[in-house]
């Protein structure tokens, strides 16, 4: 066969060249070192020696290039590149090949022999790429299959253990720090609906006073708190709006006072003047037939008269923190010495009093008031709120006072049912530019025209503007906000309680504690920024099991605020509807022109500093003279 003969001749020629190269290996090494050639030429000699031994079995090499030097250089380069990338040959193997190529011995050349280059030499150049891809797929699939579960499962188990470990540590660390267990295990509220005040160890004269005020059965917060307070324990009571928190702390205080009357027996702190006045009226009514001396210490009144009243040692002081702190700083020791023997201290709406929110915070004044009160071991401290904030909860985690029973916590519907079940929450979408038009027509719908309404605003300027506007539109309206004199605030609230005014436009000073049973609708003209403020606002209606509606005006930019409120109260607002009423049509037909004209008149009255009704406001000098 000519081809076989030619192949044998080629191999003989190659063998002769190989022997000559081996004999001249040192010279070649020196040339390579001087010229900087790669080790491929040295590899070429060793690979030819291997090929000479396996030439009889490899018929595919007959199609190779006649120039064995060029062919072997290309194959060697390709073999090294592929072996590095696909076969995983390490850099240490390459270093050994370089050293063996420099030595030029046959034994060193044999050490370069490996299965990977020999396999490539036996495959044809045409099929080489395909075979390499198949080998790569097999090599990739083989190690990856068992590795996947290793990397997927092991770290997850580690993370799980790490996630569980801190919880256990936190629980072990937090448990001894708590002075009391969970509220549910601390106070067992009687679930019997027929429970009476007599069963709570309330004195008969107080039961009769409660009956005279149409209070026949205790509520949940009253069932839980009254017996424990009578035992001398400090209390943190949380319950939704309109659940009778004032009675829960007033009854045990009055019962203890009647048994041992003394000067300044208790101090009650509230965040607003109107709430302080309301508590004073309720406490005096409950104290009948006993004669209780109570003093109201709030802003807007003469401090000299208040100082004289404090010096007379009244039985009970109902105050706002700011004004009482002013007396502590400025009045003499004769005025405030009676505060050092107080038996009870009550923080009503404690979440607002203890809020440390920077501007407008009452906490510094509260701390000033506590600075002259007896130490905790010599008094009872009672906290009541409708929203359990972190500041309030932190007080329950304090260590118990030595020699005293631990603080007990009674929470009734403060989180899941912060909104009464009898309250309907609704929203009304209104354009920002025509909010007043929609308000006017909403108040005149057949279902709302006779109902008592409270409209809440975020700013005193907005409340003042709506007061002017609604009066010009012939609504029976009054207002309540911090820019009004105290005497006018009391008069306006009295008019609304007596139904002389159907609508009360107010800021958040009226959002807490005020108990006006006749209120049927609460309108959020401006949406509050804090969802807890929303809870207190809508709590002015649907009190003590009565029904009520809360309607929130929603503009284009108020969606996020509404979603936050819904998440906080756990209930979604429904769209406001009234049968047979298309509010948008009524606004376009009846309100655009009329409300626009009255709006300009109201703004003009405010600019001219006129009171509601068109009378010019009296100057400060005349007010002081009176």
Swiss-Prot record:
InterPro entries: DEAD/DEAH_box_helicase_dom (IPR011545), DEAD_box_RNA_helicase (IPR050079), Helicase_ATP-bd (IPR014001), Helicase_C-like (IPR001650), P-loop_NTPase (IPR027417), RNA-helicase_DEAD-box_CS (IPR000629), RNA_helicase_DEAD_Q_motif (IPR014014). It is found in: Nucleus, Nucleolus. Residues 1-25 have a biased composition (Low complexity). Residues 1-183 are annotated as: Disordered. A motif (Q motif) lies at residues 195-223. Keywords: ATP-binding, Helicase, Hydrolase, Nucleotide-binding, Nucleus, Ribosome biogenesis, RNA-binding, rRNA processing. GO terms for biological process: rRNA processing. Residues 438-589 form the Helicase C-terminal domain. Residues 161-173 have a biased composition (Basic and acidic residues). ATP-binding RNA helicase involved in 40S ribosomal subunit biogenesis and is required for the normal formation of 18S rRNAs through pre-rRNA processing at A0, A1 and A2 sites. Required for vegetative growth. This is ATP-dependent RNA helicase dbp-8.
């Amino acid at each position: 066969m000519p081809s076989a003969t030619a192949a044998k001749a080629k191999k003989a020629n190659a063998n002769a060249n190989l022997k000559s190269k081996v004999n001249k290996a040192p010279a070649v090494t020196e040339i390579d070192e001087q010229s900087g050639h790669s080790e491929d030429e040295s590899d070429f000699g060793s690979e030819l020696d291997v090929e000479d031994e396996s030439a009889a079995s490899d018929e595919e090499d007959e199609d190779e290039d006649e120039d064995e030097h060029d062919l072997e250089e290309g194959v060697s380069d390709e073999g090294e590149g592929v072996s590095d990338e696909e076969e995983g040959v390490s850099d240490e193997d390459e270093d050994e090949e370089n050293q063996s190529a420099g030595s030029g011995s046959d034994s060193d050349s044999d050490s370069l022999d490996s299965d990977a280059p020999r396999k490539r030499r036996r495959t044809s150049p045409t099929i080489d790429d395909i075979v390499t891809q198949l080998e790569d797929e097999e090599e990739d699939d083989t190690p990856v299959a068992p590795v996947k579960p290793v990397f997927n499962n092991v770290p997850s188990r580690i993370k799980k253990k790490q996630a569980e470990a801190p919880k256990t540590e936190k629980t072990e660390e937090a448990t001894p720090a708590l002075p009391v267990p969970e509220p549910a295990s601390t106070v067992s509220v009687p679930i019997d609906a027929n429970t009476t005040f007599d069963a709570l160890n309330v004195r008969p004269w107080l039961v009769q006073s409660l009956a005279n005020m149409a209070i026949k059965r205790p509520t949940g917060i009253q069932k839980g708190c009254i017996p424990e307070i009578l035992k001398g324990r400090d209390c943190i009571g949380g319950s939704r709006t309109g659940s009778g928190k004032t009675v829960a702390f007033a009854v045990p205080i009055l019962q203890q006072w009647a048994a041992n009357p003394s000067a300044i027996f208790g101090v009650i702190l509230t965040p607003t003047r109107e709430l302080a006045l309301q508590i004073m009226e309720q406490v005096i009514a409950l104290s009948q037939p006993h004669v209780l001396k109570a003093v109201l210490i709030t802003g807007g009144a003469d401090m000299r008269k208040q100082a004289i009243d404090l010096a007379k040692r009244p039985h009970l002081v109902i105050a706002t923190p700011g004004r009482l702190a002013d007396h502590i700083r400025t009045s003499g020791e004769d005025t405030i010495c009676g505060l050092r023997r107080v038996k009870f201290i009550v923080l009503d709406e404690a979440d607002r009093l203890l809020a440390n929110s920077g501007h407008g915070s009452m906490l510094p004044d509260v701390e000033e008031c506590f600075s002259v009160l007896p130490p905790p071991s010599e008094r009872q401290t009672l906290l009541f709120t409708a929203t359990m904030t972190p500041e309030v909860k932190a007080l329950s985690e304090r260590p118990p006072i030595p020699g005293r029973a631990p603080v007990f916590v009674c929470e009734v519907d403060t989180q899941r049912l912060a909104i009464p079940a009898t309250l309907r929450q609704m929203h009304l979408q209104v354009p920002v530019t025509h909010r007043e038009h929609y308000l006017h027509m909403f108040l005149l719908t057949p279902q709302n025209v006779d109902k008592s309404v409270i409209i809440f605003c975020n700013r005193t300027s907005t409340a003042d503007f709506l007061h002017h506007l609604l009066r010009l539109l012939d609504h029976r309206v009054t207002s309540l906000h911090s820019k009004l004199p105290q005497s006018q605030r009391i008069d306006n609230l009295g008019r609304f309680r007596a139904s002389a005014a159907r609508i009360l436009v107010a800021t958040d000073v009226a959002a807490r504690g005020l108990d006006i049973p006749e209120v049927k609708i609460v309108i959020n003209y401006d949406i509050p920024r804090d969802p807890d403020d929303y809870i207190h606002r809508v709590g002015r209606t649907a009190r003590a099991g009565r029904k009520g509606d809360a309607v929130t005006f929603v503009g284009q930019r108020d969606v996020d605020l509404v979603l936050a409120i819904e998440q906080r109260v756990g209930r979604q607002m429904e769209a406001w509807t009234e049968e047979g009423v298309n509010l948008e049509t009524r606004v376009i037909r009846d309100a655009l022109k009329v409300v626009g004209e009255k709006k300009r008149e109201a703004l003009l009255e405010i600019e001219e500093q006129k009171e509601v009704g068109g009378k010019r406001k009296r100057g400060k000098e005349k007010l002081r003279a009176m």
